[in-house]
Amino acid sequence: MQRADVDVNGRLLHVYNVHLGTAILERRYQAQRLATLVADRHVTGPKIILGDFNEWMRGLTTTLLSTKLKSVDLSQYMKRRRTYPGLFPVLHLDHIYYDGDLEIDHIEVLRSRRALIASDHVPLVADIRI
């Protein structure tokens, strides 16, 4: 997991990029660790947690994060929410969670040659307003 703190007009936005493991025990540990980090009261301001959660059904990570954060409903923005594998997506493994005073304006899946070369997932791109 990576965290970047971005200054947006004097306000800190905390962006967490995750790539959780494929093994259930590994993902369970990572989910609990992620939930602890997100709940840290010393990290004030809005948070976005996004990336490859390796969960296509409601699992532990989804359950833990849904109690603390809002989840982006991709069906509002696109017909197909699938992001893996990139060439012919059949699974919805990539998610965006957020809290604070954030608004999601638009989300799209980039389907380009460059995106297919860069990753085995198709990227989700979100326009977010603070």
For each predicted feature, which ranges?
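Active-site regions of metal-assisted phosphoester/phosphodiester hydrolases
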Residues: 1-130
